[in-house]
UniProtKB/Swiss-Prot annotation:
It comes from Chlorobaculum parvum (strain DSM 263 / NCIMB 8327) (Chlorobium vibrioforme subsp. thiosulfatophilum). The keyword Cytoplasm applies. Monomer. Binds 30S ribosomal subunits, but not 50S ribosomal subunits or 70S ribosomes. This is Ribosome-binding factor A. GO terms for cellular component: cytosol. GO terms for molecular function: ribosomal small subunit binding.
């Protein structure tokens, strides 16, 4: 990534995080923007979202993000329009890195305990 795309990605991540904090329903799962990757032409921003909640809540929130992409882009545009000629299209992806890290941690703990302790 070039310095420009990194700066744009950082700005988008910061602004989208603020939008998520203020605009998403409070009763739902906790959602955090973990990473934003922007294409070289600044036309598409891939937004990775970490969601803490049940599988059903995750699916519901991802569906919400996909259906409300245009509305979220419009809110984003109102916040940063003076910095860009054209706001990138937003694509949302679920980031399961936190979940995978927890699973690896559990596996490591079970290996450290050994098979004799697991049988107790």
């Amino acid at each position: 990534m070039s310095i420009r795309t990194e700066k744009v990605a950082s700005l988008l991540q910061r602004e989208l995080s603020a939008i998520f904090e203020k605009e998403l329903p409070r009763s739902g799962p906790l959602a955090t923007v973990t990473e934003v990757k922007v294409t070289a032409d600044l036309g598409i921003a891939r937004v990775y979202v970490s969601i803490i909640g049940s599988e059903a809540q995750r699916a519901e929130l991802m569906e919400f993000l996909h259906t409300e992409t245009k509305a979220l882009r419009k809110i984003l545009s109102s916040k940063i329009r003076n910095q860009f000629r054209r706001i990138p299209e937003l694509e949302f992806y679920e980031d399961r890195l936190f979940e995978q890290a927890n699973r690896i941690e559990e596996l490591l703990k079970s290996v450290r305990r050994g098979p004799a302790e697991e049988q107790l």
